[in-house]
Structures are given as C-alpha cells and as structure tokens.
C-alpha cells in the first residue's frame, strides 16, 4: 500500500498558513487530515546529478518567475482533468530550519490502476533569509501490475504523470519508450527496490517502484540565491 512507503508531503511543524484556495470551490481542508495524507519521501540532501539548462545558477527572481509559470500550467492540468486541488503557502520547520513552501497538491483515495494517488508540486525556500531554494514535483501512481506482467504493456505518456511532468519541464515532445521499457523490466523481474534516475535537461527524474505503486519525482538543483 502506498501509505507504507510514501511519507507525508506536508510533514513538519507548520508555523503559519499564508494562502489557501481551491480550483473549483472554497471548501476548507482539514489540516490534521492533510498531514496524514499519502505523499512522497523526502531526500532533499541527495546528491544532484543534473546537467543542463535547469542546472543554471538562477537568481531568486528567476526561480520565482519559473515557479509562477509552472504553477499556472499545473493548475491548467488539474482543471483539464477535473481535479480538485489545494494551493497554499506555508512556513514550517524542517530539520530545525525555517522553510517557506508554496505548493499545489491533490490526493485521490483508492485510485484505479494507472491513476494518480497523490500529486505535489512546490517551490521551497530555506532559512529565515530564504537564501536557497528548489522546485519539486512528486507523484504516486497505482500501477496495473497484471497488464504489465501479462501483456508487457505500460506507457507513462498515457498516464497523468506525463501531463504534470511536461507542465514542469515544458517539453511535450519527450519520447517515453526507454523509460517504459525500464519500468516494465523492473515489474516483470520483481525488483522490489527498482529505481530509475534520469537527467532531464538539468532536472533529476527519479522513478521508484514499490509493490503496486510507482513513485515519481522531478527535482531541480538546490539554487543558492546568495551568489
């Protein structure tokens, strides 16, 4: 079950909630429930392998502009798919450090095969002076294991992951053939800890498969705004 390996996206001690809205209504979200929702393992200190345009030493203003553009595209995808989502800005504590987190999030309880269980996209800045920051996309997808094992069929492009991934990269021409083959191979060979890591023009894409769920991450470098 995805709850066993996806740790709460919105974990940490929330100090202040600054902004909150929904795509289709103004329904309030129970904060205690949100903290318990499925989410994605954090490993912000992992070594960064990306090379490319996104690995540029962007300024805070440049990353802020990129985040605004990406967030707008993420909202367009949510609206197109008819998904209710949360858009918030929070200040919280992570590892004894103040973190400002601007994010868009939704979850889908009991998803059908090849459907998203949860999605988070956010721009985090760290420290009281917000001297560094990064962009992160995290998605949990329930796999159709029978289809993959029996028919050797899986296409990431046909899932909503591609919509959100392309909203971040702004690249709609990607060929998913190689990544699909790797995912099928992991499932067929029952590699319980199978992980695929790819550089997408300076963003690091990480796909981890555990049981019947696929965990998708797309991370920018940690930008140093003091440079």
PLM regions with names:
Residues 16-20:
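C-terminal motif of bacterial Sec signal peptides marking the signal peptidase cleavage site
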Residues 1-5:
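Positively charged n-region of N-terminal signal peptides that target proteins for export
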Residues 7-8, 12, 22-105:
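N-terminal, intrinsically disordered, polar/charged segments of Gram-positive cell-envelope systems
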Residues 119-188:
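Long, charged/polar, surface-exposed segments that mediate recognition or autoinhibition
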Residues 198-227:
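Short, charged interaction patches at domain edges and termini
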Residues 133-139, 194, 203, 214:
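Envelope-exposed proteins and targeting segments
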Residues 110-111, 133, 141, 189-190, ...:
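Structured, amphipathic secondary-structure segments that form assembly/contact surfaces
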Residues 81-126, 173-209:
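A cross-family detector of function-defining hotspots
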